[in-house]
């Protein structure tokens, strides 16, 4: 059974995992990596910071430093992001004529959501503790542990997508190592002088 934990704080650094429904390789199938970066851009526009990430073929790990959300729950922000990315991924799947995949995603929508107009279940609806759904990062040591975990993902186990962490395109590993990468992030050490409790 999946478990959802409500977050009652409105700022801080969080480790977030978002998983595609039934672990389908939807980012890869749709070439939807850009949809994640669009969401990251949206978060930045609201004053939040992307501190580390990896986009795997079927899931995302990301460290997000939330600046004071002014009463908007972090759960809601993550939920909005999932909806935003879902629309983009479904659009891309339609463009690629992935009829079978779309049918499988449609079959996963429960009756209640279907009545509300939902047509595809792109992401797992809840956060599973064993997947480390989200945990608040309270120290640099903990953040480092999570960054190491994030950056090692493409080299780990059955994935074996690259030999070296910095070789994986859709990750902040290269940015931490060289200061360059496909997407600009804010290193966690740069956050030390930023008061996340203050709104933008």
Regions flagged by a language model, labelled:
Residues 1-200:
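Short catalytic/metal-binding and nucleic-acid-binding patches
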């Amino acid at each position: 059974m999946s478990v959802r934990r409500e977050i009652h704080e409105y700022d801080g650094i969080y480790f977030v995992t978002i998983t595609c429904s039934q672990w389908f390789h939807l980012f890869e199938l749709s070439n939807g990596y850009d949809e994640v970066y669009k969401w990251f851009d949206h978060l930045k526009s609201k004053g939040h910071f992307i501190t580390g990430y990896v986009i795997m073929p079927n899931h995302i790990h990301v460290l997000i430093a939330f600046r004071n959300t002014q009463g908007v729950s972090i759960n809601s922000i993550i939920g909005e992001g999932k909806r935003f990315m879902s629309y983009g991924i479904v659009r891309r799947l339609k463009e690629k004529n992935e009829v079978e995949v779309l049918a499988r995603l449609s079959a996963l929508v429960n009756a209640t959501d279907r009545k509300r107009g939902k047509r595809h279940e792109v992401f797992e609806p809840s956060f599973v503790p064993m997947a480390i759904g989200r945990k608040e990062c309270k120290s640099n040591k903990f953040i480092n542990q999570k960054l190491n975990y994030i950056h090692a993902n493409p080299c780990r186990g059955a994935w074996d997508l690259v030999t070296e962490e910095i070789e994986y395109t859709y990750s902040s590993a290269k940015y931490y190592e060289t200061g360059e990468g496909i997407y600009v992030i804010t290193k966690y050490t740069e956050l030390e002088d930023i008061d996340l409790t203050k709104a933008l």
